[in-house]
UniProtKB/Swiss-Prot annotation:
Pfam families: MutS_I, MutS_II, MutS_III, MutS_IV, MutS_V. The gene is mutS. ATP binds at residues 625-632. It comes from the Bacteria. HAMAP family: MutS. GO terms for cellular component: cytosol. This is DNA mismatch repair protein MutS.
Amino acid sequence: MQTTDFNTKASSPKSTAEHTPLMKQFFAAKSDYPDLLLFFRMGDFYELFYDDARKAARLLDITLTQRGSSGGAPIPMAGVPVHAYEGYLARLVALGESVAICEQIGDPALAKGLVERKVVRIVTPGTVTDEALLDERRDTLLMAISRSKQGYGLAWADLAGGRFLVNEVDTVDALEAEIARLEPAELLVPDEDHWPEFLRGRIGVRRRPPWLFDADSGRRQLLAFFKLHDLSGFGIDDKPSATAAAGALLGYVEETQKQRLPHLTSIATEVASEAISMNAATRRHLELDTRVDGDTRNTLLGVLDSTVTPMGGRLLRRWLHRPLRLRDVLVQRHHAVGNLIDAGADADLREAFRALGDLERILTRVALRSARPRDFSTLRDGLALLPKVRTILAPLDSPRLQTLHAELGEHDATAHLLISAVAETPPLKLSDGGVIASGYDAELDELRRLSTNADQFLIDLEQRERASSGIATLKVGYNRVHGYYIEISKGQAEKAPLHYSRRQTLTNAERYITEELKTFEDKVLSARERSLSREKLLYEGLLDTLGTELEGLKRCAGALSELDVLAGFAERAQALDWSQPELDSAPCLRIERGRHPVVEAVRDHPFEPNDLDLHSDRRMLVITGPNMGGKSTYMRQNALIVLLAHIGSYVPASRAVIGPIDRILTRIGAGDDLARGQSTFMVEMAETSYILHHATPQSLVLMDEIGRGTSTYDGLALADAVARHLAHTNRCYTLFATHYFELTALADESHDGGASGIANVHLDAVEHGERLVFMHAVKDGPANRSFGLQVAALAGLPKAAVTQARRRLVELEQRGGESHSAQMAPTALDAPQQFGLFTAPSSAAQEALQALDPDELTPKQALEALYRLKALL
């Protein structure tokens, strides 16, 4: 058998003159979409050829084969079945690929020569709206970025949900934070150099011609799309970079979707000052919806998400990644949750929502005219629930709940229309028929009656023909090619009546047609075709009617989403014993008996609650204690409590009083960032630098073991300097965990003639024989032991190694390598020298070396100096 190396032969040809008509048709379609995978419809398969086939075979793990040859070379080919293509399409989109779907136009059986084909649809990671291609509980976003001397403009759209937003940021750090928050599936950038490092290698980045990101052309694009004379109503007149990005995004959507987008009706502007800022590192460290190792289990979202509907789940995720600083909004949410709990209404709402479905995305498909029959039935059932939801909300006095009650609107007429028009359980596809309910349209009912009665007519005809012909084995049947027929076996064919006309000859039988059967066939087949045609017409009419109601229906879906989130908050508060936080205008952070929501959820034994008390005169806690003692857990739990309070949730504490917070910034144990060529220590210093430059007196900062990535005294010096800067320059709320006991002396120092604003707390452990028991309780004052060797033994180090470590520890302590005074001479940190692991006494060689100036030496002088130094050793 001849084999072909598809990796070295048969690249996509430059000339198509010598190719077969089919391959010429393929190349014509491919030339319009050179960067996309082309799904080329051939019967029951979508085929891919040449480089597309190689790529798809690798990504989808499907067979790479060949389809004969064309132009004198074999044609690499791979294919996926039409009936299962959506699964393959979803996998490609998840990998950041875009696909052009080239369909057969018309009926191939009726085509004379080559069947016509045309690209009817383009699917990209950021523009998908099909239910099968979407994660139901996560937004699928398309983002565009423009840049200028002033910074970056961002625009992003959720085409499946009908949202379109813009923003502007000043710095690369802020840009990275926004991308980390929004996690776009597809990112459009100008095809230029010098983009930030974090964009390189990112899945779904599309480079577009730079001229598409021009502010003036973007403005014209937006005005034309929204049919407006100015953009003042959107509040983006003073945002040229955002306008440029929005125009580029809109142009890409129109280019790929090939249709109007009536569900995008406005642009919203996000205001950075309205939300608590969190950079990419903070989101990663706090494990909001993804753990540091990439797992999505045992995260804050996993514990918090008690929503019933997919659209509620997506809204909760958005809230979680953008905690608000708007006190009035948050107080209204807290009050709404409390009102639901007090009235016992959360359970009733959640029960009603179980039949609700994803109305938000269904309405998008209605707007795009791609809604399927079961979208209609889901929308019908959801609207039918509104009276029950209104009844539940009516007696509640929460201002926010009453606002949402009003936003539900009145949709009785639409509900009644769908109840009367749509079958109780419609089929998956319109082409299957039976979507429109009986009794809705008299003409359709009559056509269906003709089709329905056909079966009985055929039974009666078969019995009559058997009786009249005397052929007991005579059968009446139907196939799609030849239509209706009367079948008689070969042995009985001579008995066929004279008025039978032969229609088809088989090996063992003859098939006939009669005038009566032909008349019936014409009538029935016509009725079925007309029935499907009539259903399609009525279906399009429903889409037209619903299209006029879209704005009100979208508001209704938004209100239902928020009610789902608030009811979920109420359920979590009761199930997990959480309390309503208090938002204070004074600077403070007081948490009584706080717990870590995720750790508490996964533990099979009670969680040890702890307090936190920070205010104007006490802004930093230096936290000491053994490894595994709970320092990181304590810091994270307080950050998560603050975050939960600022999305409107209750919090895992008996009481929480929280003053104004503008940022949450963290530096908690990152691993090596090898992909970007950065060591653990480099990452640590970069994140620390960001915090020192951005923290304000209203920021909450978590610092975990600063300085551990370098030598002992280097690390100690850095940790001391960072702590002082945070306490005295930034003056932010800081939780500073450290293994340097010397830092506990900072609390006793004065600053600007007053107290330091620093306090010591520790997490303790006790030894019971050879066992070490962690207490996990936060106590005032510094720790007096680290228990490092005991933790090493717990980790399974060989006993011989632990014993050797104990001996070495005694030696080091006797040599003064480690101070037990818990104090550090400040001058030691100010001295301009580099300390090693142990401090050696000065020597003549060292003094001679320090006297040298390498920049002033010639090569010969340097060599002579080296010999002199060697002689001193």
